[in-house]
């Protein structure tokens, strides 16, 4: 069975967003807009949020104040945002997996997917399994062959979802990978570079190393070719029919004022889709490039993500 709905949603909605008009609604905030950031200061998501805040202020005169509310893979921010007023003056940037797989995999996280208004995505990850080039592995098939020959393969994963992915790779190919949990995408990257790990998941920080020839993207986990390694195989080539990348997006509390929702989501999409914007240039270099999915398309994307998360959890039992 193919689980291609999620990646199809991303592509179709991205095309629609790129061709949509960006007329702003007549809404204006009554004070500062708090932009809650689900991750620590200094990382890629934090940088993206701060660039977005700067450009919203510059283009629309809104005072947008970034605030880091990190912890529990995005759950701390989500729990806090849920109880904010739905007037458009409290929004948050997070990884959408935290509101799909994260909700289903965690017992009573303090919120559910329907506790939020989905405004706009900004970009997606370039999730892949990586290895050092000097290992001599060109793709995941080479790693599988090494494991089948008796080699112990240590594999870094920065989330329970990606640990599930390693389990499914092993199950589909008759091998057992030794999973090591790491802190963030750079944890896996650093482990591979230091020879502490044989392979690891990375979601974008590996790109410079791949382009320099020091690292190899062994397999794409996003259901389509990687920007830096368009010839890398897909997980489906090895019997795993799930997508393991994530999108980063801006959300608000449930039942947001309709005029506020329209104005904010359109303003974000305009910045994301503008090739001259600092945000667009940054996410092109650091992530998968601009992907603005808004409104009803974003709602449908999240429904598909939740459906796929349920199937993944069932498959990984």
Question: What positions do the PLM features span?
Answer:
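Sec/Tat signal peptide C-region and signal peptidase I cleavage site
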Residues: 19-25
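Short coil/turn segments
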Residues: 40-42, 96-97, 127, 132-137, ...
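C-terminal lobe and pocket-closing loops
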Residues: 124, 206-281, 300-307, 312
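Surface-exposed aromatic
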Residues: 282-301
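Bacterial N-terminal signal peptides
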Residues: 9-19
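Hinge/capping helix and adjacent helix->loop/strand transition within the periplasmic-binding protein
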Residues: 27-33, 80-89, 103-187, 235, ...
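N-terminal (or domain-start) structured segment
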Residues: 25-115, 151, 161-162, 172-201, ...
């Amino acid at each position: 069975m193919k689980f291609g709905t999620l990646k199809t949603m991303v592509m179709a909605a991205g095309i629609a967003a790129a061709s949509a008009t960006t007329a702003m609604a007549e809404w204006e905030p009554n004070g500062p807009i708090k932009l809650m950031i689900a991750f620590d200061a200094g990382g890629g998501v934090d940088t993206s949020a701060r660039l977005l805040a700067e450009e919203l202020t510059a283009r629309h005169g809104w005072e947008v104040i970034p605030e880091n509310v990190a912890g529990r893979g995005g759950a701390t921010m989500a729990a806090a945002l849920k109880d904010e007023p739905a007037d458009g003056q409290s929004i948050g940037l997070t990884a959408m997996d935290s509101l799909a797989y994260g909700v289903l995999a965690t017992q009573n996280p303090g919120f559910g997917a329907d506790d939020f208004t989905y405004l706009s995505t900004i970009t997606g990850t370039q999730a892949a399994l990586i290895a050092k080039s000097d290992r001599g592995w060109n793709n995941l098939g080479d790693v599988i062959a090494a494991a089948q020959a008796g080699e112990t393969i240590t594999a870094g994963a920065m989330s329970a979802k990606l640990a599930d992915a390693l389990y499914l790779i092993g199950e589909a190919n008759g091998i057992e990978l030794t999973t090591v949990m790491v802190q963030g995408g750079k944890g896996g990257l650093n482990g591979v570079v230091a020879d502490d790990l044989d392979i690891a998941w990375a979601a974008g920080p590996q790109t410079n190393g791949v382009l320099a020839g020091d690292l190899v993207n062994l397999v794409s986990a996003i259901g389509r070719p990687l920007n830096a390694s368009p010839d890398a195989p897909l997980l489906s080539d090895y019997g795993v029919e799930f997508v393991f990348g994530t999108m980063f997006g801006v959300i608000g509390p449930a039942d947001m004022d309709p005029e506020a929702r329209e104005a904010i989501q359109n303003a974000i999409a305009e910045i994301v889709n503008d090739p001259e914007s600092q945000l667009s240039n940054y996410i092109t270099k650091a992530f998968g490039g601009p992907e603005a999915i808004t409104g009803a398309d974003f709602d449908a994307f999240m429904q598909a993500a939740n459906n796929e998360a349920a199937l993944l959890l069932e498959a990984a039992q």
